[in-house]
């Protein structure tokens, strides 16, 4: 990983869960086996199997737990699990890369795999907007190390610094690139051993995050 760059870990689930039986049909027979819709269980996928009280990660090649009434995972639902880790991979040419949880055909198991996305990305910085007083509006901007309540994060600013892979001996980059709270200038580049005579461009994007609040209530 390139020093002094951010790493973003995204964990989530798919939008099409699997059930013991059709949840819209109260008369459908239930046997405690996750099998609806039929034929959708994928042995090359990881699932989050959870009800309101218990949850677990399970590879699809393994045997899922009993979800029948009276079991630990009674009426649990299986959600396809997603894991993505974005970072700048160090090297002669820095690269925006990501690690994902995916099926490995060679080992016939789930594993963390690396994908290179964009070459020439030297730095990546994230600034988050969050609603600290629960009034529905972003009121605070903060960086990764300063976020304490991730369920309140509702927006994201992304800064990417890209560099050419061709050194121009006649060009000396004297610019300062502001990636949020980090100023990348000639001294910064020299500190991390990056060529100064590369042409660079700073990209910035704002996005809204879907971050619903989940509240679980039990009967008294």
Region spans (language model):
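C-terminal functional modules
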Residues: 207-209
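N-terminal pilin/flagellin-like segments and related low-complexity appendage regions
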Residues: 1-159, 165-199, 204, 216-220
């Amino acid at each position: 990983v390139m020093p002094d760059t951010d790493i973003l870990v995204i964990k989530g689930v798919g939008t099409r869960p699997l059930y013991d039986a059709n949840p819209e049909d109260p008369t459908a027979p239930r046997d405690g086996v996750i099998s609806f819709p039929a034929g959708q269980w994928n042995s090359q996928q990881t699932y989050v199997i959870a009800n309101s009280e218990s949850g677990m990660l399970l590879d699809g090649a393994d045997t899922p737990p009993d979800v029948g009434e009276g079991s630990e995972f009674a009426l649990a639902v299986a959600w396809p699990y997603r894991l993505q880790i974005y970072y700048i991979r160090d090297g002669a040419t820095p690269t925006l890369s990501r690690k994902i949880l995916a099926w490995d055909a060679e080992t016939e198991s789930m594993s963390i795999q690396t994908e290179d996305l964009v070459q020439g990305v030297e730095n990546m910085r994230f600034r988050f907007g969050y609603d600290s007083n629960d009034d529905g509006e972003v009121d605070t901007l903060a960086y990764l190390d300063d976020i304490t309540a991730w369920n309140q994060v509702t927006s994201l600013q992304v800064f990417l610094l890209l560099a050419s892979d061709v050194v121009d001996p006649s060009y000396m980059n004297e610019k300062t690139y502001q990636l949020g709270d980090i100023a990348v200038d000639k001294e910064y580049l020299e500190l991390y051993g990056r060529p100064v005579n590369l042409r660079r461009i700073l990209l910035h994007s704002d996005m809204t995050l879907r971050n619903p609040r989940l509240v679980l209530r039990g009967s008294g």
